[in-house]
């Protein structure tokens, strides 16, 4: 059976030079960077039967097991080496998440991934700055017109022309492949950080707020890779709970 994500993009890539799909990973984490993945699928990509076979199990990265994601990641890299597609990742640091907030940092990571995929493709696709109305220029020639799609709603702070597709990683092959690149790239980074900071169990939770991660934050405090913006509510709640416990202990001492 043909992957419905393949069919979705194959149909909509008509009358265009191809599709660029972009997604992110790590937006809701307590630690580590936010990473974006960009996949450029030239229109000829959909004319090669071997490519369809290679993409048969591509899906939203969140719907895949870790070993499935890693195998598909390797397949995407291999397709890139064969010049069937172009891929890139970009990231925004914890410091940038703090200064730009998570939305701004996500846009920054996406922008970097898009710029890098343009470089890797030797300018086959070039970023187009948004027009005043933010819409695609329908007068462009087919050879120049690329469908640029990001997962979710359009990003106001992303400066390049694009469209947003709600739950796009469940519809679009290019976006789903971008989500795999972003997720595996980020997971690899968090596993490396886990060797340096074993208390937080980054290799398992990848920076999300698992019970073990939260217990380590309570006992060890945050490290340099934690996001201050994301920890404030947690730390404030912990301090409030501690004050309540202390008050209760004080009251009990008078009984």
Language-model segments: what does each one mean?
Residues 1-255:
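RNase H-like, Mg2+-dependent phosphodiesterase core
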